[in-house]
């Protein structure tokens, strides 16, 4: 494939911590994650390298979900009357819906919406599938694209009009307590998933005015980006019986009665990949967790004329061994300078680089370079597979540890409104304080401190920063991407 974007080893990516927007835009292009030149605003093309990262990320998620969920695939189009059935839900999306009004040259009798989310797509079918208490629980998920006419400033992978990687799970239960247990289970699923990516997260219950439309409550996962803004990366919703009543989803109890089911749903999107890129990357480019990287190992031959063929043969043999052992490996045998190869593979975030030259070959060894720390170690070629596996485990642990440390360093406590305001003026990041959870009080805090309330953490107790009533821990932030 001919490269559509010219690589420049002297290109300035931008300082990640101080010029994050420029850095992020440049890395997406330079590392061939996506091509943003598609002629529709807010829509992009996944390039082969980016698509492999996406594929590997979803592989991790599917491995977790497939333990007790079933994967399905529902249509893209939603009839207007079905979308309109749940008024509260629709009100949350009505300004963002794309409509199909014609089939060819003929005007449709009823408009069809491109799904903004899939409750109104899936739940009419659930009403047909659920019959008896013996059918429950049901747990489904799908990975699809969704469309929202985003009117704010679009940002690739973060705020888009086509969400190309929308994972949504929908579950159906006989009782409210079972739905509550599923919410807790969904939170554990996402914790395991984000931990496997090394992504730090805050878990909060969203304030009532910011919950998912039609839900009883929303639990959200947020992470902190390099520019000091938080990014919502996952949500879990307890839907209660709201949608069951709208779409007549009932089951027969053991006693022969008919009752409405209880439901949950939880989703995440392209933002997960954006957070992996943003949080772990550096001024040299991507720095990917091994399970996500398109290539986990790149082999770079150090060629001198005297032993060129012997070195190449050793590299080819090592590639075969590593592939047989389950590694995703690439042998870079291009006839260009080794330094250029180092630059490109560092920029693309390959976790481990293996260098073999004539001297290494004489010793039966290779030099292994870590992308996350830049450290180099010499390892015997015999048994190098185990060395690489141990290094990959250590790389993930290191990425995870330093990401958590950075986020936690940006959380600051405030005991008064004045102190919270001062932190907003002087710092970026997250403010921790006590909030009673009441909407009127929360709105008052937002106005006085000039922040958005992120939500409530269940742990901790004290008195509300505004009204003085007993309160759990609340979190605010100067800027939040929801």
Curated annotation (Swiss-Prot):
A Pfam family: HGTP_anticodon
List of residues binding Zn(2+): 436, 441, 464, 467
Binding site for L-proline: 117, 119, 148, 237
InterPro entries documented for this protein: aa-tRNA-synt_IIb, aa-tRNA-synth_II, aa-tRNA-synth_II/BPL/LPL, Anticodon-bd, Anticodon-bd_dom_sf, Pro-tRNA-ligase_IIa, Pro-tRNA-ligase_IIa_arc-type, Pro-tRNA_ligase_II_C
Entry's EC annotation: 6.1.1.15
Residues noted as binding ATP in the record, renumbered to the chain: 148, 150, 232, 235, 269
Protein's GO biological process: prolyl-tRNA aminoacylation
Region span, Interaction with tRNA: 346-376
Gene Ontology MF, one: proline-tRNA ligase activity
Enzyme type, top EC level: ligase
Keyword presence, RNA-binding: no
Keyword Secreted recorded: no
GO cellular component, one term: aminoacyl-tRNA synthetase multienzyme complex
Catalytic activity: tRNA(Pro) + L-proline + ATP = L-prolyl-tRNA(Pro) + AMP + diphosphate
Entries under PROSITE patterns matching the protein: AA_TRNA_LIGASE_II (PS50862)
Keywords carried by this UniProt record: Aminoacyl-tRNA synthetase, ATP-binding, Cytoplasm, Ligase, Metal-binding, Nucleotide-binding, Protein biosynthesis, Zinc
Classification via NCBIfam families: proS_fam_I
Similarity remark: Belongs to the class-II aminoacyl-tRNA synthetase family. ProS type 3 subfamily.
HAMAP family: Pro_tRNA_synth_type3 (MF_01571)
Subunit structure and binding partners: Homodimer. The dimer is functionally asymmetric: only one of the two active sites at a time is able to form prolyl-adenylate, and only one tRNA molecule binds per dimer. Interacts with LeuRS, which enhances tRNA(Pro) aminoacylation.
Job of this protein: Catalyzes the attachment of proline to tRNA(Pro) in a two-step reaction: proline is first activated by ATP to form Pro-AMP and then transferred to the acceptor end of tRNA(Pro). Can inadvertently accommodate and process cysteine.
Protein name: Proline--tRNA ligase
Organism: Methanothermobacter thermautotrophicus (strain ATCC 29096 / DSM 1053 / JCM 10044 / NBRC 100330 / Delta H) (Methanobacterium thermoautotrophicum)
């Amino acid at each position: 494939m001919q490269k559509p974007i010219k690589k420049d080893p002297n290109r300035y990516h931008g300082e990640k911590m101080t010029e994050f927007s420029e850095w992020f835009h440049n890395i997406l292009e330079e590392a061939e994650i996506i091509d943003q030149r598609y002629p529709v605003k807010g829509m992009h093309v996944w390039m082969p390298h980016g698509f492999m990262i996406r594929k590997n990320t979803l592989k991790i998620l599917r491995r977790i979900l497939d333990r007790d969920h079933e994967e399905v695939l529902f249509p893209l189009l939603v009839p207007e009357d079905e979308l309109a059935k749940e008024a509260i839900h629709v009100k949350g999306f009505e300004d963002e819906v794309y409509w199909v009004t014609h089939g060819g040259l003929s005007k449709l009798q009823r408009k069809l919406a491109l799904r903004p989310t899939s409750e109104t797509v899936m739940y009419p079918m659930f009403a047909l599938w659920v019959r008896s208490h013996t059918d429950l629980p049901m747990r489904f998920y799908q990975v699809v694209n969704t469309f929202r006419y985003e009117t704010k400033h679009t940002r690739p992978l973060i705020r888009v009009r086509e969400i190309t990687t929308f994972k949504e799970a929908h579950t159906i239960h006989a009782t409210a307590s079972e739905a509550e247990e599923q919410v807790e289970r969904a939170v554990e699923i996402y914790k395991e998933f984000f931990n496997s990516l090394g992504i730090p997260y805050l878990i909060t219950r969203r304030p009532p005015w910011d919950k998912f439309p039609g839900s009883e409550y929303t639990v959200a996962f947020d992470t902190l980006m390099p520019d000091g803004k938080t990014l919502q990366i996952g949500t879990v919703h307890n839907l209660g019986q709201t949608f069951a009543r709208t779409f007549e989803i009932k089951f027969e109890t053991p006693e022969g009665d008919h009752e409405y089911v209880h439901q949950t749903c939880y989703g995440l999107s392209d933002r997960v990949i954006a957070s992996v890129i943003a949080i772990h990357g550096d001024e040299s480019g991507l720095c990917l967790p091994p399970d996500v990287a398109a290539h986990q190992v790149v082999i770079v031959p150090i060629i001198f004329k005297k032993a060129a063929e012997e070195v190449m043969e050793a590299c080819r043999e090592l590639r075969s061994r590593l592939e047989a052992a389950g590694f995703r490996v690439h042998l870079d045998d291009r006839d260009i300078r080794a330094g250029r190869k180092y630059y490109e593979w560092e920029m693309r975030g390959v976790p481990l680089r293996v260098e073999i030259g004539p001297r290494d070959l004489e010793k039966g060894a290779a030099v292994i370079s870590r992308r996350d720390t830049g450290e180099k170690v010499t390892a015997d070629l015999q048994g190098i597979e185990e060395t690489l596996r141990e290094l990959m485990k250590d790389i993930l642990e290191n990425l995870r540890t330093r990401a958590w440390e950075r986020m936690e360093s940006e959380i600051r406590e405030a005991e008064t409104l004045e102190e919270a305001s001062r932190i907003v003026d002087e710092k970026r990041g997250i403010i921790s304080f006590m909030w009673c959870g009441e909407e009127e009080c929360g709105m008052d805090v937002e106005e006085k401190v000039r922040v958005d309330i992120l939500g409530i953490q269940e742990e901790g107790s004290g008195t509300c920063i505004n009204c003085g009533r007993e309160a759990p821990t609340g979190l605010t932030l100067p800027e939040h991407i929801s």
